[in-house]
């Protein structure tokens, strides 16, 4: 019998093995509908057609990731890296076309680990359609060593998935009244979900719709409970920038994004201490989108 090689249920257990990303071959995404929440309607970023990332920038970023990998290895953690791919190639499907892709810098966006299962997320950004390819050699290896492997339904990313002419310039994102995504098909980023054993928390955001969360809940059945949360954020993306469980009984929250629906009370009712993180000093440098805005309104 194969020894369990994938076995992760939460965000705080001692780390034994991890995938650290890579920016080799990175591209800069052209503007596309999934990026609408982040740029005003008349901004020049909406005319950005994508580009190859400058070699100097790639090397500087890769050096940081390599150093991070070394720190983990020095602590006894097994570090795996994605396969190098050329993300500067265009992508064309029957539903869309993009001139550049993204990178393999963020495995946490692509792969959701629930226990002994690896789920490839059905992400909503067109430029990331084939991002999973960088991780396939590792996933196949883990599968052969005993892990479960699931690929969520791949979204077509046709125009029906996105709200036309969407902007958060004057009205904040709202999952009911002002959502950038429709419920045309299920989609989510893995980083939208935060794991606490059998309890999984998420917030509908610019890359995750409720159809995606419904698919995940039905897929996992009664093995896990998926809880929807809502925080004040003009254009939310990924819950782990807002809520991070540190250990059983302690959860860190972003004071700039207070909970709007009372869902944080579930932690308090179960004797968890909810602590606000110190105020952040923002510095934004992204390879995944055009000249991003550097601030979330609070």
Predicted regions mapped to residue ranges:
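The feature marks the mature, well-folded catalytic cores of soluble enzymes
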Residues: 1-289, 293
């Amino acid at each position: 019998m194969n020894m369990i090689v994938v076995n992760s249920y939460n965000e705080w257990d001692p780390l034994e093995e991890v995938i650290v990303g890579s920016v080799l071959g990175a591209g800069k995404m052209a503007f596309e509908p999934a990026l609408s929440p982040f740029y005003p309607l008349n901004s020049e970023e909406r005319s950005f057609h994508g580009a190859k990332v400058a070699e100097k920038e790639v090397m500087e970023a890769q050096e940081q990731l390599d150093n991070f990998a070394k720190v983990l290895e020095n602590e006894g953690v097994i570090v795996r890296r994605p396969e190098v791919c050329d993300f500067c190639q265009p992508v064309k499907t029957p539903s869309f076309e993009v001139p550049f892709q993204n990178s393999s810098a963020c495995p946490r966006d692509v792969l959701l680990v629930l226990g002994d299962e690896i789920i490839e997320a059905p992400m909503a950004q067109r430029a990331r359609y084939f991002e999973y390819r960088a991780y396939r050699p590792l996933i196949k290896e883990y599968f052969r060593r005993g892990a479960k492997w699931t690929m969520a339904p791949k979204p077509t990313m046709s125009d029906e998935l996105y709200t036309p002419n969407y902007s958060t310039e004057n009205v904040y994102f709202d999952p009911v009244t002002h959502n950038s995504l429709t419920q045309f098909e299920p989609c989510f980023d893995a980083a939208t979900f935060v794991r606490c054993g059998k309890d999984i928390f998420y917030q509908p955001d610019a890359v995750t719709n409720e159809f995606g969360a419904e698919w995940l809940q039905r897929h996992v059945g009664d093995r896990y409970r998926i809880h929807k949360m809502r925080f004040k954020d003009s254009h939310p993306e990924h819950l782990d920038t807002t809520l991070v469980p540190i250990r059983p009984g302690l959860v860190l929250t972003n004071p700039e994004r207070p909970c709007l629906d009372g869902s944080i009370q579930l932690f308090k009712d179960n004797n968890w201490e909810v602590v606000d993180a110190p105020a952040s000093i923002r510095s934004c440098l992204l390879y995944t989108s055009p000249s991003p805005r550097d601030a979330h309104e609070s």
